[in-house]
Amino acid sequence: MTSTNEPIPTEEEIKNGFKFIQDEICKFLITTTGGHQQYSEDKWDYTKGSGGGISRVWEGKEEEGFYLNQDYQSQNNKCDKIEKGGVNFSYIVGSNLPSAAATQFKIAPDTKYIATGVSLVIHPYNPNVPTIHMNVRYFEAGDVWWFGGGVDLTPVYPKLDQVVEFHSTLKKVCDQYGQEENKTSYALGKAECDSYFFLPHRGETRGVGGLFFDHLKSDKAKTWKFIYQLGLSFIDLYKPFLVNNSSISYDKVQREYQLYRRSRYVEFNLLFDRGTKFGILSEGRTESILMSLPAVCKWKYNYKPEENTPEANLLTFLRPRDWLNENQENKN
């Protein structure tokens, strides 16, 4: 099915669109963090074909004591806000898909394929600022093509009104650019996200969800427009957290709980994430694949937070909920 109202995007337009998304997000992160915390840029080549990528990585100071200092809040504007983060753009061309992928998608051996997109993860220092993940991508092999992408939020000390605002922003993007027939509605994307970012061995979701779409292959022009706008929406989605929550003071208990909760993030990425599995199986670039992991995390044996604590409150958020219809009188 193709659109009769809009021109079908070319491979070059899609590639350049993703590159623009990377640039805009990086500008936002630099500006919002005060301009002093710069990323390191790594331009790399795809050695098993052609193309490559640009990885932009933030790695904060390793001065744990400083970030727990009582003067942290007064010095906040001079402090690094991103402990570990990265915004990656890639565009690769190859002809040797993993056999499992080639079989699943009925792609003949040695078929040329292209894969391009932007992937990002931000792990902040402050436990009051949630981790965020976003991915927007395009794949093509012969006559087969599809778009995919999504965004999800992983707070440690969530505030209900902020979670509702996050989902409201996502719904606005879907209402304006998504379509039910293209499977890009908010309801479908949210349900898929709740299902995908679930840790079965823990019985909980990774965070408070968001949107997740994969194998979108109906109406290329409209689907590309949706994916493009979803990528740019990152700024509106994350700005309230990065601007408003970074100045909230925190103590060692909160920092320790943040590190403990990060272990769940690592478990999901290494055990269940499709992108990680595909990257490893296809002998992709290891540094880019594992960029999403936090700099520091902890595991504690059989740990359970005490009842009626802010730490225990998080667990009430780690299940699928109809965020847009939450009772605002019960704000946390």
From Swiss-Prot:
GO cellular component: cytoplasm
Protein's recorded name: Oxygen-dependent coproporphyrinogen-III oxidase
Lineage of origin: Eukaryota, Amoebozoa, Evosea, Eumycetozoa, Dictyostelia
Gene designation: cpox
Cited function: Involved in the heme biosynthesis. Catalyzes the aerobic oxidative decarboxylation of propionate groups of rings A and B of coproporphyrinogen-III to yield the vinyl groups in protoporphyrinogen-IX.
A Pfam family assignment: Coprogen_oxidas
Subunit structure: Homodimer.
Any GO molecular function: coproporphyrinogen oxidase activity
The reaction(s) this protein catalyses: coproporphyrinogen III + O2 + 2 H(+) = protoporphyrinogen IX + 2 CO2 + 2 H2O
EC number: 1.3.3.3
GO biological process, one term: protoporphyrinogen IX biosynthetic process
The organism of origin for this protein: Dictyostelium discoideum
Enzyme class label: oxidoreductase
Family as reported in the entry's similarity comment: Belongs to the aerobic coproporphyrinogen-III oxidase family.
Alphabetic keyword roster: Heme biosynthesis, Oxidoreductase, Porphyrin biosynthesis
